[in-house]
Amino acid sequence: MSKADELRLLREAIKNFPDALAVWSRDGQLVACSDAYARLAAAAPISEAAEYQSADGRWLRRSVRALDDGGRIELLADISDLRRAEQASRFVAYHDSLTGLPNRRLLDDRLRQAIRLAQRRDRMVATLLVHLDDFGRVNDTLGDGAADTVLREVAERLTRCVRKADTLARAAVDEFALVVCDLKDAADCRVVAEKVTQALAPEFRVGGRTLRLKASIGVSLFPADGGDGEALLRSADAARYRARQLRR
């Protein structure tokens, strides 16, 4: 077989290679590429990054190997499934499985971010703890399934009380936390607290029954009530406890 035939067969093999593969000369000229690579290159320029998202939404990992003659082989591997698995794993690690809200781990991180932003902009951060005082009774009377339904409904109602920039998290079994960012006036926090009270006031319908929940709310403000997230949560919890005692 002549060298010309060998080269033709090699080009044909590369052209039909199932993955995105390209062979480059040492002076940067494209020698041959697979159809998969050609389709990617036609849709958008190939990125020099090790990993990137293509025009069609796929995540690609780019690897390059040097050839003895100074050229190189470039391979693009589709890692979309791996990326989705990583994203799902991160979501599980940072979110409550029942309500889909941020969990305590993510709440702590969001608080740190909110405080850093407030320090740069000379603003306040409000932390509200909402405790469902008689949730244990719901659980004991109606069972776990009904209790879960109530918690999901509480989460939906509270979601309507915050802005996109704010955070609503499930801080404990029967407790939710709201982080309200970038406040100019402490009065804005009272507005949010009133929204929460109004959101939880209507009856909950579960399994053909109706019930009302009593909730106690505690509020703390950065920087007046604490300089970090842990201090703000402690202060809000103390305020919540005082509010509950006063109501009795």
Where do the language-model regions lie?
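Signal-transducing coiled-coil linker helices
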Residues: 12-15, 59-97, 104-116, 166-167
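Cyclic nucleotide signaling catalytic output domains
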Residues: 168, 195, 199, 205, ...
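PAS/LOV sensory domain surfaces, especially short acidic/polar patches at coil-to-helix junctions
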Residues: 27-38, 132, 238
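Sensory-domain cores of signal-transduction modules, predominantly PAS/LOV
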Residues: 19-20, 27, 124, 216-218, ...
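Core hydrophobic beta-sheet residues of small sensory/regulatory alpha/beta domains
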Residues: 23, 30, 120, 127-129
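Sensory modules in modular signal-transduction proteins
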Residues: 3-29, 35
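Conserved long alpha-helical elements within nucleotide-processing catalytic cores of c-di-GMP signaling
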Residues: 90, 100-126, 133-163, 169-173, ...
